[in-house]
């Protein structure tokens, strides 16, 4: 059938190591995406603020 169905499961230590790596990568991407607007606004020349009037 499908060859992936019969593969061995990785041991717990290897799975935890991979999970830590993936969580660290995800966290770093979140930090980069959250910090990007602040960094871009710091380096932009225009000092205009966005004002929304209701």
UniProtKB/Swiss-Prot annotation:
UniProt key word Acyltransferase: no
UniProt-listed GO biological process terms: protein transport
Keywords linked to the UniProt accession: Acetylation, Membrane, Mitochondrion, Mitochondrion outer membrane, Protein transport, Transmembrane, Transmembrane helix, Transport
Entry membrane topology: Single-pass membrane protein
Subcellular location(s) of the protein: Mitochondrion outer membrane
Principal subcellular localisation of the protein: mitochondrion
Residue positions, PTM N-acetylmethionine: 1
SS bond partners: none
GO cellular component terms given for this protein: mitochondrial outer membrane translocase complex; mitochondrion
Transmembrane segments: 21-43
Tissue distribution: Expressed in roots, flowers, young cotyledons and leaves.
Function: A component of the complex responsible for the recognition and translocation of cytosolically synthesized mitochondrial preproteins.
Subunit structure, interactors included: Forms part of the receptor complex that consists of at least 6 different proteins (TOM5, TOM6, TOM7, TOM20, TOM22/TOM9 and TOM40).
Family: Belongs to the Tom6 family.
Name of the protein in its database record: Mitochondrial import receptor subunit TOM6 homolog
Organism from which the protein derives: Arabidopsis thaliana
Lineage: Eukaryota, Viridiplantae, Streptophyta, Embryophyta, Tracheophyta
